């Protein structure tokens, strides 16, 4: 904005909620237009948002490029914004949703000790989704503003019936994480 040299005018205009001033470089204020301010969440909603959501879900380890599964997930998931510092999952909690991380990064903490980081392409909450009697084994907190696709355990189970490879991929991911934790404990 400072490239345009009229910060004070922009400050007044952008005081409107969810509105941004857009104009090409070297164009006077008379040619600037008001446009809705795009949020990270907006990228995954509305026009073009579903396509981007499907692409992000297809890139998930659990989806492994399966376009049909990615579309099923996009149809059934609730896409949510998570603010930096917000806790997504609390250790010991009894909820059992699974979250696919579409954007952003998270810390995974067990009993006050950071054990892992998770980012776009990863998922969290699968243990409680697969075993509903299982309480949450970790606290997952956003390190930056993030976007997740949330599925209830029931919906995830139904998708697992239609796409049985999900359970094989979860088993592979859990095995990878166990090996990762074991290698850290040896160091």
Model-found features: residue ranges?
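Cytosolic regulatory regions built on CNB/CRP/Popeye-like sensor folds
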Residues: 1-187
